[in-house]
């Protein structure tokens, strides 16, 4: 049986540090686990250190746009001034309430200098831009805590500054990147052209890609060599409409397709782990069918595995 690939998954964001660092074992899946913020990064380090199957976990290091407001770039400012600078808001009351619960911002340069480990980290990610995300009332998104959404957003200019910094880290270390992109397809492509196009060792994974096929084929796959662009497909985004998912698969070179769950993996419950495995099996079956109805899922799984090895090396 061919090993399954989860090219983009997570651990839980846990500010209270109660995380147990248990993924229930690899479950026969090669996992590329993203970090998005300082809290899940601490948890991911624990998981990588405790894993009994270290060859099945690839570690990502990054700052997701949903958490980019937790960092400042350049000179330190007081807490209120920082959040005034990086947040976009019209409701002063909402802003004041958020500032009360948000932590003191961290120096992005110090964070990278202190935490980045070239030996441990395989991928720079998750990084990117998000035009739609609104901050929850508790200050930042946590998988296990439900909070109402405010109307406050992180300024795109700040998201871009953070994203560019991680692009430069990828250039410096020759690591691949995994990109989050919501309604910023052209902007992200422009930035990657500026920051990465001439750095041939940096590969790019467009995770759960939701842009147009025209942007994908006419920009990403036209300007970048096909061996540098990968598209990671998820069940709940790319195959929400199976026909659209099939059409996306057929439009792509078979050499650039990856599979993902985009779910936290640090829940050892067997039924939860089984559900993650079934998502990846579903994707392989859909990909195989889109290529050729005579193919079976194992053939797609083999190709995806080979693609991931090229992405990560």
From Swiss-Prot:
This protein's record includes keyword Disulfide bond: no
Cofactor dependency: a divalent metal cation
Pfam families: TatD_DNase
Entry note: cofactor: Binds 2 divalent metal cations per subunit.
InterPro entries on file: DNase_TatD-rel_CS, Metal_Hydrolase, Metallo-hydrolase/TatD-type, TatD-like
Binding site for a divalent metal cation 1: 8, 10, 126, 262
GO MF annotation: an example: nuclease activity
EC number: 3.1.21.-
Keyword terms of this UniProt record: Hydrolase, Metal-binding, Nuclease
Major enzyme class: hydrolase
UniProt-annotated binding residues for a divalent metal cation 2: 126, 180, 207
N-terminal signal peptide: none
Keyword Hydrolase: yes
Role summary: Putative deoxyribonuclease.
Family designation: Belongs to the metallo-dependent hydrolases superfamily. TatD-type hydrolase family.
Note: Present with 125 molecules/cell in log phase SD medium.
Record's protein name: Uncharacterized deoxyribonuclease YMR262W
Organism from which the protein derives: Saccharomyces cerevisiae (strain ATCC 204508 / S288c)
């Amino acid at each position: 049986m061919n090993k399954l690939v989860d090219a983009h998954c997570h651990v839980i964001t846990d500010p209270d540090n109660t995380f147990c660092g248990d993924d229930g074992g690899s479950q026969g899946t090669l996992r590329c686990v993203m970090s998005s913020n300082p809290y899940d990064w601490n948890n991911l380090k624990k998981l990588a250190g405790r894993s009994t199957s270290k060859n099945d976990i690839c570690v990502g290091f990054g700052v997701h746009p949903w958490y980019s407001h937790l960092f400042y770039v350049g000179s330190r400012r007081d807490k209120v001034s920082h959040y005034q600078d990086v947040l976009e808001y019209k409701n002063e009351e909402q802003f004041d309430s958020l500032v009360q619960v948000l932590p003191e911002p961290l120096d992005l340069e110090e964070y990278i200098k202190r935490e980045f480990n070239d030996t441990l980290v395989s991928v720079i990610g998750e990084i990117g831009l998000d035009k739609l995300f609104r901050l929850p009332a508790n200050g930042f998104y946590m998988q296990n805590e439900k909070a109402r959404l405010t109307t406050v957003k992180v300024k795109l200019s700040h998201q871009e500054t953070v994203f560019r910094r991680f692009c430069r880290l990828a250039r410096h270390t020759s690591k691949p990147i995994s990109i989050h992109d919501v309604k910023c397809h052209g902007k992200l492509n422009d930035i990657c052209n500026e920051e990465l196009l001439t750095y041939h060792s940096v590969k790019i994974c467009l995770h759960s890609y939701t842009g147009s096929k025209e942007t994908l084929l006419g920009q990403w796959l036209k300007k970048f060599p096909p061996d540098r662009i990968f598209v990671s497909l998820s069940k709940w985004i790319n195959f929400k409409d199976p026909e659209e998912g099939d059409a996306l698969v057929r439009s792509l070179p078979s050499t650039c397709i990856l599979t993902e769950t985009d779910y936290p993996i640090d829940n050892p419950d067997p039924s939860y782990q089984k559900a993650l495995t079934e998502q990846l099996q579903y994707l392989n079956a859909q990909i195989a069918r889109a290529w050729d109805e005579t193919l079976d899922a194992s053939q797609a799984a083999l190709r995806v595995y080979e693609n991931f090895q090229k992405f990560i090396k």
